[in-house]
């Protein structure tokens, strides 16, 4: 059976441009909101819970426009939705939707996960290893564990941002809804954690104790690796992790801006034929149209990482370019079809490449393109009545059907 993938949680502003070029029938709409609302204030469509443990007046006021969902992960009937704290007034950075209890497509309820207390900021901004500050994206592994990086950082505008505590890698056992590992990232590894937007977990379901987390840092242009059994973290640095100046200009819903984001996403590919454990790892920068590949055995070698780029540099391979306007945030690999899917920022689309074919622009296709509803999250004004947030899903097989990636 094809892997069920949630292709994206995307935010659309009040600005609607262009026509729908590809039918949205290939993607199934799971949920949508006009805006998230505060259940404790008696809103008409309440779907979030606010904390009574406020930091200050701004924290105690639910920020409708600041609660912007950024990441989503599906697992066994539950959707784990992240809302990074980039503004005050966000009750929970990590949330869950029980799909069985939310059969309607409109305005599902977000519940703080694993509970409200863990998500609540302390009134004095004090560090607390039992609490989560800000999360961008999550991943569930084959052993029913939810992995994510808490940046520990409040990205408030106007110079109000602050590092509440050290960034930390969390692992929560979803069968008991409790944390089973929290690794505080040491300052010699990275000073601030807000540049870590994604995480990819490499584990064999038959050996849950041997797992590795790959975490890109678009700000420092590094790739961090955490070994669960080792209980340590190491890092790789490479010129391929940097942005490509030619592809730093973005145009989203007629809003033009420049980004310098380096390595942004990591996707674990298929197993090598001659090995039961060696797999290809794909990675790319946000401001780039290139894709890089490396063996997971390289990344799992702590000694090699310590020897430096002069030793391991040639192990990273530049596969080529995807084509014009294919700058991508996240991407994911489906082991059944062998297809790599991309969230393409500049053309409001989901792209694809069948990894069994040469890496050329001609072998890259578009699964879905929608200039009306699939607009990448940006600093846009929200429409109070129009739908602003959507979650779609589709099987990898049906998503790739009829494209060059089939």
Task: Outline where the language-model segments fall.
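Short loop/turn segments immediately following beta-strands, especially the blade-tip
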Residues: 98-104, 228-233, 294-307, 353-360
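Conserved beta-strand positions in repeat-built beta-propeller and related beta-rich domains
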Residues: 81-87, 148-152, 210-219, 281-287, ...
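Beta-rich, blade/repeat-based domains predominating
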Residues: 62-76, 127-146, 188-213, 242-281, ...
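N-terminal signal peptide
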Residues: 11-32
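Surface-exposed loop and turn segments in beta-propeller and other repeat-based domains
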Residues: 34-61, 106-130, 180-192, 235-258, ...
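Short, solvent-exposed loop/turn segments at conserved positions within beta-propeller repeat blades
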Residues: 86-91, 157-166, 218-219, 277, ...
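Asp-box/WD-like beta-propeller blade repeats and closely related beta-sheet repeat scaffolds
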Residues: 125, 129-132, 152-209
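Beta-propeller domains
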Residues: 25-62, 76-121, 157-163, 170-175
């Amino acid at each position: 059976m094809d892997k069920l993938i949630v292709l994206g949680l995307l935010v659309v502003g009040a600005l609607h441009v262009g026509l729908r070029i590809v039918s949205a029938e290939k993607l199934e709409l799971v949920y949508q909101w006009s805006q998230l609302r505060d259940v404790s204030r008696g809103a008409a469509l309440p779907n979030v819970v606010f904390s009574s443990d406020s930091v200050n007046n701004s924290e105690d006021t639910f920020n409708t426009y600041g609660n912007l969902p950024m990441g989503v992960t599906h697992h066994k009937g539950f959707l784990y939705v992240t809302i990074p704290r980039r503004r005050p007034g966000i009750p929970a950075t990590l949330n869950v939707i029980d799909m069985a209890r939310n059969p309607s497509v409109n305005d599902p309820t977000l519940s703080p996960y694993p509970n409200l207390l863990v998500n609540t900021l302390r009134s004095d901004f004090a560090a607390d290893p039992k609490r989560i500050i800000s999360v961008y994206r999550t991943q569930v592994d084959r052993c029913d564990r939810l992995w994510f990086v808490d940046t520990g950082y409040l990205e408030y505008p106007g110079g109000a941002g602050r590092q509440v505590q050290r960034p930390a890698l969390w692992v929560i056992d979803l069968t008991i809804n409790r944390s089973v590992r929290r690794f505080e990232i040491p300052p010699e590894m990275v000073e601030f954690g807000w540049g870590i937007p994604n995480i990819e977990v490499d584990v064999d379901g038959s050996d849950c104790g041997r797992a590795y987390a790959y975490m890109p840092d678009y700000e420092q242009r590094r790739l961090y690796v955490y070994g669960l059994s080792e209980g340590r973290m190491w890092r790789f640095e490479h010129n391929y992790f940097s942005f490509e100046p030619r592809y730093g200009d973005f145009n989203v819903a007629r809003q033009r801006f420049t980004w310098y984001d380096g390595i942004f996403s990591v996707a674990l590919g298929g197993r090598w034929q001659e090995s039961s454990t060696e797999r290809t790892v794909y990675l790319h920068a946000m401001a780039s149209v290139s894709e890089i590949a490396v063996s997971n055995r390289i990344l799992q070698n702590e000694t090699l990482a310590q020897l430096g780029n002069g030793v391991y540099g040639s192990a990273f391979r530049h596969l080529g370019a995807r084509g014009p306007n294919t700058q991508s945030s996240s991407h994911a690999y489906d082991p059944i079809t062998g297809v790599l899917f991309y969230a393409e920022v500049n053309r409001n689309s989901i792209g694809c490449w069948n990894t069994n074919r040469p890496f050329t622009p001609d072998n890259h296709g578009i699964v879905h393109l929608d200039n009306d509803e699939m607009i990448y999250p940006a600093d846009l004004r929200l429409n109070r009545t129009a739908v602003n947030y959507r979650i779609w899903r589709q099987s990898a097989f049906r998503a790739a059907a009829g494209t060059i990636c089939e």
